[in-house]
């Protein structure tokens, strides 16, 4: 299963919401099975509960959840331990670049968002990012509830066109289109 947010046009307290999509994926057939949409507040604190709700709505509790970052909708942070606690699902963030805790914390400080300390504690997980080589190039994995070998295997099974796992890529396009449709309403 892959989850991602749509385009975020504006950050800060007046930003509103953006769409988030979760797409369940069949590794054997290499195709999407179902999807679900939700809304998260940009720079809010609801990403973990919204993603967990989408996972449960898709009947995918216990199945790994792939992300392309621990941030959704600006600095709305996904807590891997929280998702696992709510759904029983391990979480794997697959970065195309080595994530920088220093840059994330700097952005978080300058944003002056509430609960900055809690957000920073979750973001500190990126310090554990492990490089993994794939046929499409290197990726950096932040895994919660998965062994390193299992995380790499999952990435290899879900890569189709590039380094980003296909269910995450499809979730991004789905959420982006939904976000665009919301802006037109």
Curated annotation (Swiss-Prot):
Name assigned to this protein: UPF0215 protein APE_0476.1
Phylogenetic classification of the source organism: Archaea, Thermoproteota, Thermoprotei, Desulfurococcales, Desulfurococcaceae
Family per similarity comment: Belongs to the UPF0215 family.
Matching InterPro entries: Endo_dU
Name of one Pfam family that matches: DUF99
């Amino acid at each position: 299963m892959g989850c991602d947010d749509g385009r975020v046009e504006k950050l800060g307290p007046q930003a509103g919401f953006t769409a988030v999509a979760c797409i369940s994926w069949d590794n054997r057939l290499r195709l999407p099975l179902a999807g679900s949409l939700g809304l998260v507040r940009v720079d809010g604190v609801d990403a973990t509960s919204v993603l967990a709700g989408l996972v449960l709505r898709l009947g995918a509790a216990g199945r790994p959840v792939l992300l392309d970052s621990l941030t959704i909708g600006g600095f709305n942070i996904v807590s891997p331990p929280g998702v696992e606690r709510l759904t029983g699902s391990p979480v794997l963030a697959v970065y195309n670049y080595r994530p920088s805790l220093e840059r994330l914390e700097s952005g978080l400080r300058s944003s002056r968002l509430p609960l900055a300390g809690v957000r920073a504690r979750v973001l500190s997980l990126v310090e554990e990012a492990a490089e993994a080589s794939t046929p499409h190039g290197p990726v950096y994995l932040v895994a919660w509830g998965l062994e390193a070998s299992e995380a790499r295997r999952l990435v290899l099974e879900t890569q189709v066109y590039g380094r980003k796992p296909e269910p995450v890529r499809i979730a991004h396009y789905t959420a982006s289109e939904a976000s665009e449709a919301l802006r037109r309403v």
